[in-house]
Regions:
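Substrate-binding pocket helix/loop in short-chain dehydrogenase/reductase
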Residues: 71-72, 76-81
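Active-site-adjacent segment of SDR/Rossmann-fold oxidoreductases
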Residues: 101, 120, 136, 141-151, ...
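Residue(s) in the substrate-gating loop at a strand-loop-helix junction
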Residues: 115
């Protein structure tokens, strides 16, 4: 925890040091490090500090974040880039610094922090939502590249009352949305029996899974492959019947070419 403000300004070690004190009071070991996750050199030094102390990195939780909330019309591009740098590139930097370590040791558990603002949208958070969906794309590909090394990558979409959300959530709801109700989801996602490529949503003691699915769709005859043809077949294109969650991007290509070959009579249905 860099200990800065919600907007990313300033820095301080108090927040991180208080967590270290809690861990040590329970008999554990911990190090506080105020690295700026947007700077790869600082992240590398942070990971080296952990390796020098413990000799392994088994778990990485990418959770650094800031807010620069404004409507897209009023927001500044510099703020947009800063939010991407911390949320998205911060996750990239930390994961990159740990990736080879996890590959070499044949084990790793990584969590990226996404958000309902990215999954579903939230007014005034175009920058934040973009970054939070960026880490989902990152997760989807890292799962494929890390599989043979037993590196599992999952995403957490938390709803919690924290320093960053204080003042944004009504007081009664804030009292229910304690970070402690999110912690069990994180711990499961970094356990030895963790799932893979899963988006878990957590808050106030409630838990759910978010999924990206694709409808089965339809193949249109060449003469119907027009905007008008799309409109005329919209119900079939959007029908949830037969929708599924692809395991990899190439499955879309296989599905579409298969439908085209069937439609053109090049293969038997």
């Amino acid at each position: 925890d860099l200990g800065g403000g919600v907007d990313g300004s300033g820095a301080g070690s108090e927040a991180a040091q208080s967590v270290v004190a809690e861990i040590e009071a329970l008999g554990g070991e911990a190090i506080a490090n105020g690295a700026n996750v947007a700077r790869y050199d600082e992240v590398e030094a942070m990971v080296k500090q952990a390796m020098d102390k413990w000799g392994r990195v088994d778990i990485l939780v990418n959770n650094a974040g800031i807010l620069r909330d404004k409507s897209f019309a009023k927001g500044e591009l510099d703020d947009f880039k800063l939010v991407l740098d911390v949320h998205l590139m911060g996750s990239v930097n930390c994961t990159k610094a740990c990736w080879d370590i996890m590959r070499d040791q044949g084990y790793g558990r990584i969590v990226v922090t996404t958000s309902s603002s990215g999954l579903y949208g939230n007014f005034g958070q175009t920058n934040y939502g973009s970054a939070k969906m960026g880490v989902i794309g990152m997760m989807n590909t890292l799962v494929q590249e890390g599989g043979k090394y037993d590196i599992r990558v999952n995403a957490l979409a938390p709803t919690a009352g924290t320093r960053m959300t204080e003042g944004l959530i009504p007081e009664e709801a804030f009292a229910l949305l304690t970070p402690e109700t999110v912690t069990p989801a994180v711990l499961y996602m970094v356990s030895e029996n963790a799932p893979n490529k899963t988006i878990i949503c957590a808050g106030a003691g409630a838990y759910s899974i978010a999924k990206i699915v694709e409808t089965d769709g339809v193949w249109l005859q060449p003469e119907d492959q027009t905007p008008e043809g799309i409109a005329a077949n919209w119900d079939a294109i959007t029908s949830p019947e037969g929708e599924r969650q692809p395991e990899a991007g190439f499955e879309q290509t296989v599905k579409f070419t298969g439908k085209a070959m069937e439609g053109l009579g090049l293969v038997d249905k």
